[in-house]
Amino acid sequence: MAAPMEVAVCTDSAAQLWSCVVWELHSGANLLTYRGGQAGPRGLALLNGEYLLAAQLGKNYICAWELQRKDQLQQKIMCPGPVTCLTTSPNGLYVLAGISENIYLWEVSTGNLLVILSRHYQDVSCLQFTGDSSHFISGGKDCLVLAWSLCSVLQADPSRTPAPRHVWSRHTLPITDLHCGFGGPLARVATASLDQTVKLWEVSSGELLLSVLFDVGILAVTMDLAEHYMFCGGSDGSIFQVDLCTWPGQREKSFQPEQEHGKVFRGHRNQVTCLSVSTDGSVLLSGSHDETVRLWDVQSQQCLRTVTLKGPVTNACIMLAPVSMLSSDFRPGLPLPHFNKHLLGAEHGDEPHRGGLMLRLGLHQQGSEPSYLERVEQLQAVMSSTLEKNVLGGQDQLRIRVTELEDEVRNLRKINRDLFDFSTRIITHPTK
């Protein structure tokens, strides 16, 4: 069985020839292009391996393409304002978007807007889910990083504002990027800021594990899958590689390029805006405002390939190509629904049901279907009725059986009495 193909997905702010391009990572061959708009920074996301979503730069809508129908825009998801960042949950159930200082959470299966989170004081700049979709992290221009529990957000009282699980306020300038490692609720999160620091946090405890100070502002951060290295993109075009395994025990330390031989990637002429590492950790992809995307060998820090675009790079990431991306016969399991701009229940003034969720079976079928809870109630009613009938039927059979036994006892007593009388007559009146 052939190994999954790794591809690079890139966008730029010009979008003259296409909105998004996909090329094979190692050969550099162009595989796909998507047309229909300009994707903003931190605004590109893959939904359930079936759709590609792109938040439009300075626009109040999100473009959605079916992966294999690259030339046909599937849907425009209208939003209340310009989308500053976008992400999807790894399980494909939810879409998160930052709009001004608010975070919007949609349910993919229904298109319902479940909640609007308003805990940032300035624009939200980056969003990302943990690998198990149990938590998501948000960073903003207010210098705050918030860790949210998805379960707590969905179960919160509609009359009360959901609270984040952790509030990380150690940065002093706007947050520019964040990266969430593997481990679900035990994951580690790297946050980058214009204050020239990258900080490493633990989701479970909320503790600060590491803070690295650089000489320039950091606009992009990522880690390899094994989390041995952390890569930080600077405003001067440099990319710094931090070895997390051999880092000294102190929690805060300055990164000194002259003392970190071979730990700096140099080649970009302008600020580095996005970074991504291949699954085996051997290749690093970087995008910059110098309108180039570069592929680097991590071991030697040498540039393997340079791809020139038509404008500043807004998104560049490495991913395993989904089956739907390379197969022309593949179709999504479910169509993408219409995404609501208003909270669930608020659009039609349905106050009693605001914030509630209804699980339905067979959403792809036409017509009204009973809800899951209604079906459970019907099943319980049938089971109770059957049990009652069985109990009543058993009592009737018991009464009939008792009557039969009583009749049999009476017959036996009569026979016994007749035998006694016969024996008495024989004894008292012997035959002559």
Curated annotation (Swiss-Prot):
Chief localisation class: nucleus
Residue spans crossing the bilayer: none
WD repeat placement: 36-75, 78-116, 119-158, 170-211, 213-257, 267-306
Alphabetical keyword list: Cytoplasm, Developmental protein, Nucleus, Repeat, WD repeat
Gene Ontology cellular component terms for the protein in this record: dynein axonemal particle; nuclear pre-replicative complex; nucleolus; rixosome complex
Gene3D superfamilies: YVTN repeat-like/Quinoprotein amine dehydrogenase
GO biological process: DNA-templated DNA replication; rRNA processing
Subcellular location: Nucleus, Nucleolus; Nucleus, Nucleoplasm; Cytoplasm; Dynein axonemal particle
Alphabetical list of InterPro entries matching this protein: G-protein_beta_WD-40_rep (IPR020472), WD40/YVTN_repeat-like_dom_sf (IPR015943), WD40_repeat_CS (IPR019775), WD40_repeat_dom_sf (IPR036322), WD40_rpt (IPR001680), WDR18/Ipi3/RID3 (IPR045227), Wdr18_C_dom (IPR026987)
Subunit structure of this chain's protein: Component of the 5FMC complex, at least composed of PELP1, LAS1L, TEX10, WDR18 and SENP3; the complex interacts with methylated CHTOP and ZNF148. Interacts with NOL9. Component of the PELP1 complex, composed of at least PELP1, TEX10 and WDR18. The complex interacts with pre-60S ribosome particles.
Stated family: Belongs to the WD repeat IPI3/WDR18 family.
The protein's role, per its UniProt record: Functions as a component of the Five Friends of Methylated CHTOP (5FMC) complex; the 5FMC complex is recruited to ZNF148 by methylated CHTOP, leading to desumoylation of ZNF148 and subsequent transactivation of ZNF148 target genes. Component of the PELP1 complex involved in the nucleolar steps of 28S rRNA maturation and the subsequent nucleoplasmic transit of the pre-60S ribosomal subunit. May play a role during development.
Identification of the protein by name: WD repeat-containing protein 18
Native species: Bos taurus
Phylogenetic lineage: Eukaryota, Metazoa, Chordata, Craniata, Vertebrata
Name of the encoding gene: WDR18
